[in-house]
Amino acid sequence: MQMAPQMGYDRAITVFSPDGRLFQVEYAREAVKRGTTAVGIKAADGVVLLVDKRITSRLVEAESIEKIFQIDDHIGAATSGLVADARSLVDRARVEAQVNRVSYDELIGVEVISKKICDHKQTYTQYGGVRPYGTALLIAGVDDNKPRLFETDPSGALLEYKATAIGAGRNAVVEVFEADYREDMNIDAAILLGMDALYKAAEGKFDAGTLEVGVVSLEDKKFRKLGPEEVENYVHQILEKHKGNENKE
């Protein structure tokens, strides 16, 4: 009988615990922590998104797993957490971008679209009969000739970063970024840094077939995903680097 009050605030999204916590939101964050590792890095000449898709079966077609999405011409998003929840939020972001284009005849701002997604997420933390989104998004793009990178949390919180990560390998990736990130690095250097961080987070268990890379450059302000040959080239550089380090040891 003593457990009944606890079960109430543990299960209900609208009920705070005595110490001010919303457990369902915290559980949604745990879903993100169990997800694939996604990385975002701002460079001097653009912004980069990378995801290790973590394919667990050789029977799965790698191309069928998508973790980096185009939101608008100048905006991309990387996801971690529940795949279906992420797809729903990506679809909503695309609609918001198109509505802004039709209504105002201009591209939506990266911060604006990020806030709209966070506002939507936040509503799912305060109404009965719903659950929080079990996914986080890294939203990257170019605003006013500046690279922008935002993280959206399941609670609806929004933070802008120079470099960050979401998913299972977040701690390992952030440790690399804190040691090696530089604001003056270019897109190529940012991609290599992101891959190096993913390599360490995955303990060396990755290859070009499991990686997705998206970039938005200041030069053309267009989002694009790197092709397999481009990804393979960067992966080769990382593997050669670590092979050389092992030989030195």
Swiss-Prot record:
An example Gene Ontology molecular-function term: threonine-type endopeptidase activity
Query: Which SUPFAM superfamilies does this UniProt record tie to the protein?
Result: N-terminal nucleophile aminohydrolases (Ntn hydrolases)
Annotated coiled-coil positions are none
Q: Which InterPro entries match?
A: Ntn_hydrolases_N, Proteasome_alpha, Proteasome_alpha-type, Proteasome_asu_arc, Proteasome_asu_N, Proteasome_sua/b
Q: Does the keyword Zinc feature in the UniProt annotation?
A: no
Q: Name one GO cellular component term.
A: cytoplasm
Where is this chain primarily localised?
A: cytoplasm
Activity modulation: The formation of the proteasomal ATPase PAN-20S proteasome complex, via the docking of the C-termini of PAN into the intersubunit pockets in the alpha-rings, triggers opening of the gate for substrate entry. Interconversion between the open-gate and close-gate conformations leads to a dynamic regulation of the 20S proteasome proteolysis activity.
What function is annotated for this protein?
Component of the proteasome core, a large protease complex with broad specificity involved in protein degradation.
Q: How does it assemble?
A: The 20S proteasome core is composed of 14 alpha and 14 beta subunits that assemble into four stacked heptameric rings, resulting in a barrel-shaped structure. The two inner rings, each composed of seven catalytic beta subunits, are sandwiched by two outer rings, each composed of seven alpha subunits. The catalytic chamber with the active sites is on the inside of the barrel. Has a gated structure, the ends of the cylinder being occluded by the N-termini of the alpha-subunits. Is capped at one or both ends by the proteasome regulatory ATPase, PAN.
Q: Which family does it belong to?
A: Belongs to the peptidase T1A family.
Protein name per its UniProtKB record: Proteasome subunit alpha
Which species?
Methanosarcina mazei (strain ATCC BAA-159 / DSM 3647 / Goe1 / Go1 / JCM 11833 / OCM 88) (Methanosarcina frisia)
